[in-house]
Amino acid sequence: MAVTLAALVERFGGELVGDSARSVRQVAPLDRACADDIGFVSQSKYLAELATTGAGAVILPPDARDATDLPRILTPNPYLYFARVSALLNPPPRPAAGVHPAATVAADAEVAADASIAAGAVIGSGARIGARSVIGANSVVGDGARVGEDCLLHANVSLYHGCQVGDRVILHAGCVIGADGFGFAPNEGRWEKIPQIGRVLIGDDVEVGACTTIDRGALEDTVIEEGVKLDNLIQVAHNVVIGAHSAIAACTGIAGSAKIGRHCTIGGAAMIFGHIEIADGTRISTNTLITKSLPKRGTYTSALPFSEHEVWQKNAVHMRNLDKLVTRVKQLEKRLNELENKT
């Protein structure tokens, strides 16, 4: 697929400088781009690459208008513009509508005529699959579950009974939506299972990465609001609420009944304690442990930066002796005060 720069500007806006008839076929990084590619620069430190790039055109911020003679589109947010161009040039493959002969669909399930159900997929009793949605190979949509319009469930997704997915949702391979939450009552040294009778409710325009698990609620529902983006290998426990348009990176764990606000960003491998609330717009750095509520919007970090092993060992020894050091400092302060009082 080839598209002219003029067509891109007509579709996405921006200011075009140079040859409007120049066609591009693909997006590419500046250092590997060829004449049929369009690249982008969103940070000034990369402007020097414009001198050597083979790209046929570039996307730049307005203040970089004169940084190159290449045909260019000027826009306040080059990264967003690049994303939209990439989506235009790389449309996802669309399987044919219909139910594969090797799929299993319950007699009372409702599947839109233009939906696609792949081989090995199972659609349970009373389940509903919306218009133009795609259910990948060997995926399971449980009894009474709902999948909205224009959704994509990749291969081997499990959507448990009663759970609901909004419109334009993407669930990547290996997702498990609606498994039982980790609920057990102690009884004389043993554990008795607590039925998890809530659901998982996923809003519109959500994307969930591969092998991420979202547990169903114990009594109330686990809720993923609209526009949330979850990376791979995330654990979302029962009764969690993740606010709209928050983004969470891989390997993060969120314990039960935590409430994460809207427009939050959480770095990879962060750990969130249960039964706490995090304010809208909060940023949490990678590998950070959040042990209590964050009522104030801000950026929070708890991870220690790396060091050479020998240096780390020495610092670890100092950490273990902090109590002794604090005691010695207090004793010294006391003696200094006594000396000052005598004089």
Curated annotation (Swiss-Prot):
Molecular function per GO: N-acyltransferase activity
InterPro entries membership: Hexapep, LpxD, Trimer_LpxA-like_sf, UDP_GlcNAc_AcTrfase_non-rep
One CC-aspect GO term: membrane
Keyword field contains Acyltransferase: yes
Active-site feature positions: H238 (proton acceptor)
One GO term (biological process): lipid A biosynthetic process
Functional pathway: Bacterial outer membrane biogenesis; LPS lipid A biosynthesis
Catalyzed reactions per annotation: a UDP-3-O-[(3R)-3-hydroxyacyl]-alpha-D-glucosamine + a (3R)-hydroxyacyl-[ACP] = a UDP-2-N,3-O-bis[(3R)-3-hydroxyacyl]-alpha-D-glucosamine + holo-[ACP] + H(+)
Keyword set, alphabetical order: Acyltransferase, Lipid A biosynthesis, Lipid biosynthesis, Lipid metabolism, Repeat, Transferase
Pfam families in alphabetical order: Hexapep, Hexapep_2, LpxD
Source domain of life: Bacteria
EC supergroup of this enzyme: transferase
Listed EC numbers: 2.3.1.191
Family: Belongs to the transferase hexapeptide repeat family. LpxD subfamily.
Assembly description: Homotrimer.
Main function: Catalyzes the N-acylation of UDP-3-O-acylglucosamine using 3-hydroxyacyl-ACP as the acyl donor. Is involved in the biosynthesis of lipid A, a phosphorylated glycolipid that anchors the lipopolysaccharide to the outer membrane of the cell.
Protein name: UDP-3-O-acylglucosamine N-acyltransferase
Taxonomy of the source species: Bacteria, Pseudomonadati, Pseudomonadota, Betaproteobacteria, Nitrosomonadales
